UniProtKB/Swiss-Prot annotation:
It is found in: Nucleus. Belongs to the grh/CP2 family. Grainyhead subfamily. Binds DNA as homodimer. Homodimer, also forms heterodimers with GRHL2 or GRHL3. Keywords: Activator, Developmental protein, DNA-binding, Nucleus, Phosphoprotein, Transcription, Transcription regulation. Methylation at Arg-9 and Lys-116 may be involved in regulating transcriptional activation. This is Grainyhead-like protein 1 homolog. Residues 248-474 form the Grh/CP2 DB domain. It holds the Pfam family CP2. PROSITE patterns: GRH_CP2_DB. Disulfide bonds: none annotated. Its main location: nucleus. Residues 1-91 are annotated as: Transcription activation. GO terms for cellular component: nucleus.
Amino acid sequence: MTQEYDNKRPVLVLQNEALYPQRRSYTSEDEAWKSFLENPLTAATKAMMSINGDEDSAAALGLLYDYYKVPRERRSSTAKPEVEHPEPDHSKRNSIPIVTEQPLISAGENRVQVLKNVPFNIVLPHGNQLGIDKRGHLTVPDTTVTVSIATMPTHSIKTETQPHGFTVGIPPAVYHPEPTERVVVFDRNLSTDQFSSGAQAPNAQRRTPDSTFSETFKEGVQEVFFPSDLSLRMPGMNSEDYVFDSVSGNNFEYTLEASKSLRQKPGDSTMTYLNKGQFYPITLKEVSSNEGIHHPISKVRSVTMVVFAEDKSREDQLRHWKYWHSRQHTAKQRCIDIADYKESFNTISNIEEIAYNAISFTWDINDEAKVFISVNCLSTDFSSQKGVKGLPLNIQIDTYSYNNRSNKPVHRAYCQIKVFCDKGAERKIRDEERKQSKRKVSDVKVPLLPSHKRMDITVFKPFIDLDTQPVLFIPDVHFASLQRGTHVLPIASEELEGEGSVLKRGPYSTEDDFAVPPSAKLARIEEPKRVLLYVRKESEEVFDALMLKTPSLKGLMEAISDKYDVPHDKIGKIFKKCKKGILVNMDDNIVKHYSNEDTFQLQIEEAGGSYKLTLIEI
C-alpha cells in the first residue's frame, strides 16, 4: 500500500480563466472526456509536449486519456481489487466545501500543469475558531490542507529531492513553517463558515477531470481521500488580483548621528546640532515584527529634504528659499547635499537631486541603508534683519512603496535641527555642559541630560500627517536644465531593474505651481546670464572684478577695453591658458559656461598695432 502512494505525484489542472469562452458544462467526468476522445492524443502530440519540456504533463494527460477511454462498467470492476475505500462518513470527517465553478475543458483547452511536490501556504480567513475533532481536522484559522490530484504511472519518473516552494497568501511576508512534504492549496474565495461539516452537500456531484484529491497525515501514515470525500478548486486569478506585501506606515526607523542638545523640554522634539556643510550619516531600516522575512518587492524610494519646522504657507516658504538663494555666492549652491562615500553607495541607488532642498534615492528594506547628508543653510539665513531668532528647520524623510500606486508616502518622519557655522555645534554643546555643571540640582527647572549619558543618535519622530505635500524649491534659472517637479513615486516596476531611471511627475509642490504667467516665466529663463571674472595684472596683487554685460567674447573685449584702456578695435586675439598649460582660443561658449567667477592673470602684448590678450587661469 505504501509503495502505491510513493508513486503519486500532485497534478493540478488549472482552468484557462478568460482566455477561451465557456462553451458548455458537463454533468459527469465521462461526459466531459467524451469530447476529448474525439480529438485523440496522438504520439505526435505527446512528442511536441515533450520537446517543449512538459514531459510530466504529457504523461499525466496520457494516463487520464487511457483511463476514461475504458467504459465505466469495466473501469469500476477493475478498480475494486486495487484500492478499496468504503464510502466515508461525512459526519466524522472534516468537510471542505465544493466550489461550484464550471470547468473550461474542450478540445483546445487540454492544458495540464504538473506540480512537483510544490508546497503552497494557505492562510484561511480569520474568523470564528473552527471546532474540529482529533482526526487531523482543522484546529486553528491558519491551517494547511494537503491536496493530491492524480496517480502517476508505476514506471520511474525523475523527481526532485528538494522541492522548490513558494508562498501564496495575504500578506506574502507572513510565513507559516510547514513540512516540505505537504502540498497546500490557497483559495481566496473560501470563508470560515464553509469549513463546517454541514457545508458539504449530501449528494455532491462528481467533478470534472480537473477535480482534486486530498491527503492528510495521520501518525506518519498517508491517508487518501477521493473525489467523493473532498473536492477543492483553486480559482483563476487575474493580474489585478495578485496582492503583494504593502509596506505599512509604521515599520521604518531613521536615525541621525549628530550631537543632541542637553536641554530637552518635556514634550518637545529632540534638537540636534549640525555644522553647516558637514556630512552626517542617516541610517534607514525597516523594523517590522516579521524580521528575517524577505518581501516580494522590497525596494522603496525615500526623499530626504530640508523643510521649515513652522507651519507656513507655500508662498512664504518659497519666499524664504528665494531670499536664501539670492545671497549665495553661486547659483548652483544647494540647500542639501549627499556625499559619494563608498559606504553609502553600497546600500542605495537611483540617486536624484530632485530639488535644491531634496534628494531621493532607492534602497532595499531587507538591508540597512546609510546616506551622508550635509545642510548648507543656517536658520538665520532667511531674513535680512539682524539679531532676530532664526527659523527652525527640519530634516524630513518621506518613503514611498513600489507596491502601491498612491502618491501618498507610506511613512514620514522628521528631525528638528539647528545649523551652526565654523564648528558652532561643538561650541554650543560645550556651553550647555558648562552651564549644566554650574547649575545646582535644586535650581533645575528643565530636566537636563547628563553629559556621560548623552546619546549622539537621534531617532526621527514619525509624522502622522501623510497628505500634506512638502514644498520643493527649484530656482527659475535652472528650470530648463533640471527635471522639473520630479517626484519619487514609482509608476512601473521596470524602474527596479535599471539604475538611474528617469523619475515620473509627482504631486510635490514646486515653484511653478503658483499663479505665474507662463510667458513671464519663459522670459526669465531666456534672460542672458551674467558672467563675473576676477582679473589682475602680473604686477598687481589685488584683483579687479569684470562684469560682462553679455556672456560672450564681445562682452569680454568690451569689459577689458573699459577697465584697462585698451582700444576695442585694436584687440586681435584673446587666449585662455588653463592650469594644465593648455592655450585655448576664447569663444562665446567658454565665456558663457566655463569662466564665471574664475580668477585670471591678464597679459597684454602689443604687436603690429594690435593687442594680444592672454588670460592665465590661477
